[in-house]
Amino acid sequence: MAVKIRLARGGAKKRPFYRVVVANATAPRDGDFLEKVGTYNPMLAKDSNERVVLKADRVEYWLKSGAKPTDRVARFIEQAGIALPEKVKKEMEVKLKNRKAKPSKKEAKEA
């Protein structure tokens, strides 16, 4: 079973609140999950300590077990000082290079 560490949306309309969960890759975004490993509240100030809260020990356990974090969650994990597996780091670097390499729509029209 492929497992991912991803965000599950909660909160009210126009007031998002996310749980960082470990879930089966094929499960719906807000559906069943295996474990809740943290929270993300985008409504708080960016410098707030409570904006992203992660259970470091459980995140490390799931990463060692082979769970793949989504792009956003991988950034949260790095900011929290938790070591990501080398494979995940390389995938993130490749995605960043691909995003930078694409020309904008204006540049594409001019060429």
From Swiss-Prot:
Gene Ontology molecular function terms on file: structural constituent of ribosome
Tagged with keyword Ribonucleoprotein: yes
Keywords assigned: Ribonucleoprotein, Ribosomal protein
Ranges in coiled-coil conformation: none
Gene Ontology CC terms: cytoplasm; small ribosomal subunit
InterPro entries hit by this protein: Ribosomal_bS16, Ribosomal_bS16_CS, Ribosomal_bS16_dom_sf
PROSITE patterns registered for this protein in UniProt: RIBOSOMAL_S16
Domain of life according to the entry: Bacteria
Presence of the UniProt keyword Ribonucleoprotein in the record: yes
Gene Ontology terms describing biological process: translation
HAMAP family, per the entry: Ribosomal_bS16
Family: Belongs to the bacterial ribosomal protein bS16 family.
Designated name of the protein: Small ribosomal subunit protein bS16
Organism name: Rickettsia bellii (strain OSU 85-389)
Source organism phylogeny: Bacteria, Pseudomonadati, Pseudomonadota, Alphaproteobacteria, Rickettsiales
Encoding gene, per UniProt annotation: rpsP
